[in-house]
Amino acid sequence: MADQQKYALITGGSSGIGRELAKLFAQDHYNLVLVARSQDELAQTAAELQQQYGVQVHTIAKDLFEPQGPFEVYDEIKAQGIQIEALVNDAGQGQYGTFTTTDINRELDIIQLNIGAYVTFTKLYLQEMVARKSGKILQVSSLGAEIPGPLQAVYHGTKAFITSFTEAVREEVKDSGVTITILEPGVTDTDFFNKASMERAKIVAEGSKADPADVAKDGYEALMAGKDKVVSGFMNKVQAALGNVLPDNLVAAQMHKQAEPVDGDERSK
């Protein structure tokens, strides 16, 4: 059995990269607190992890589109007397289409999930970690943080925020004993694109997708090594590097071409 005091909290922990990260923590004998919207998916994931790795898995079904969601998760974990040694902010969504045709209410929800929840969880748990001089935080950002994303303008913007925000906070706590790591995946084979109505984008429909297990491994190893940031995948590293040296308008044009819909209709659907 895992050490009763060694817990990792993972948002978006029932699927995709978050689920693969949960497996890696469990292999290293971390107990888990998994947060997602679907109780059914959480229960299935928890049962599999408990059976395979013999760890304790607590699940919290919570809608992190709601600003109070992270606070409620924090209070519930605290009420159970659980100390979080590792925080993984992974839950996130996007929306595909030209900004003039996308749904503003959906975008405001995405901003709350991709930024609000990250900032809240980071604030609440970083304060505890700094006070005890130990802890690790993994922020799942995106390659999109490094480059503008036509047809995903809000999503890329939220990820640029997360990377910039994390780099600033990391500097503030650099001598505290707490490490904060950024994981920037590229296109990964998860349900993200279905939720974003993005399956018709050329980069998704015709391009290759990374295995979420490989992405999770890159992030987990970087987290445990105390690294600042990892871009997962060689070609993504190349694209991130080019994004930092080429003119912004050229990068935006290249990304626009990659994200074009196969049906030619860029409007949100």
What are the functions of these language-model segments?
Residues 98-100, 106-111:
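Substrate-binding pocket helix/loop in short-chain dehydrogenase/reductase
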Residues 12-16:
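Conserved glycine-rich cofactor-binding loop
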Residues 142:
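Residue(s) in the substrate-gating loop at a strand-loop-helix junction
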Residues 172-235, 245, 249, 253:
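SDR active-site lid
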Residues 28-44:
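Conserved glycine-rich Rossmann-like NAD(P)H-binding loop of the short-chain dehydrogenase/reductase
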Residues 122, 158:
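Active-site helix of classical SDR
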Residues 90-95:
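Conserved NAD(P)H cofactor-binding loop of Rossmann-fold oxidoreductase domains
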